[in-house]
Every structure is written in C-alpha cells, then in structure tokens.
Amino acid sequence: LDVNELPADAQNKLPILSTLDFIENGQNVILSGNCGTGKTHIAIGLGIKACLSGYKVFFATVPLFITQLKELRSTKSLRSFQSKLEKYDLVILDEFGYISSDKEGAELLFTNLSIRTGRKSTIITTNLSFDRWGEVFTDPVMAAAMTDRITYKSYMVDMNGESYRMKETKKWLKES
C-alpha cells in the first residue's frame, strides 16, 4: 500500500495514529469510506504495530464477531469472554455494516462495544456513514447511542477515494 495514494485525511492522520497514543488514551479509530481504499490494511497495520509494541490485540470481522457472541451466549460463556475482551488493549472490528444484523446481534455488539468505551481502544472499519448505522442497529435509539459512544474522542478517518482493487483491475485489463 502506497501511503501517498491514500485519501488525504488518512495521509494526515496516519502519522498520528502510528504513535499508538490513541491506545494509551483509550481512544477509538473509525476508518470510514468506500470499498478498496485501504481501511482494513491500515487497521491491520496498526494492530501489528500494537502487538509488536506489547499491546494485546483482538481482530474479527463484525459478522463473525456477532456470530461468536451469539454462540457464547447460547453456551452461557458470554460473561467469561467479555472479561477477556475487556483486557485487550485494542479490538479491531472489520467490515462494520457490510452485513446487517438481527436485533439480538445488534444488541450484543452494542453491549460489548459499550463495555470498552472511554477505557480501551477499538478500531472500526466501515463503508457506512454514521447516518446509516441504523441499518446495522435495527433500533434507531440504539444506533444513536452507539454512534455517540463509539465516536466520543475518536479519530475519524475519511477513507473515501478510488478503489485500489479497481485501479489494479483496470491496469491488468489494459495489459491483457
């Protein structure tokens, strides 16, 4: 990933985020933009750097995370997992909003993100603007509360730009 090809907001904020001070301060990072602009790549890069710096990091896609939470609830081991989740310095949740969730999944996601608010850091990658978070959280009140909590003192990184994959595909087609 060529940093110079990232959207301008990402180019400006990446040096700040790379210090990992946001983890020390319990701040969140929201990487928001269209597909193929490097959101997951940046999130994973920050996660790897955090691991190498001695932080405990958890990564999951939101759909798999919700499925895991539902399974843990059904086996009555959710509280044990929540205790472990609270100990991670950084949780990275990828693909927020790519797949909508049912009410139970939305409530579980809300509860488990709320536990961390203001204390531990979470990175979320999403292709949805905040006004569309209600599509994930089926309840508009829950969507508003989640947006309020997750964005409080957060770094918002606008990742809207041209898709790297599409750019590579066009290049490949020209060469073929």
PLM-predicted stretches and their roles:
Residues 20-21, 119:
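Non-DNA-binding regulatory cores of transcription-related proteins
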Residues 26-30, 46-69:
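Conserved post-Walker A coupling segment in P-loop NTPases
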Residues 1-20:
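N-terminal pre-Walker A segment at the start of P-loop NTPase domains
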Residues 25-42:
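Walker A/P-loop nucleotide-binding motif
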Residues 1, 43, 61:
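Conserved hydrophobic/aromatic pocket- or pore-lining residues that grip, position, or stack substrates
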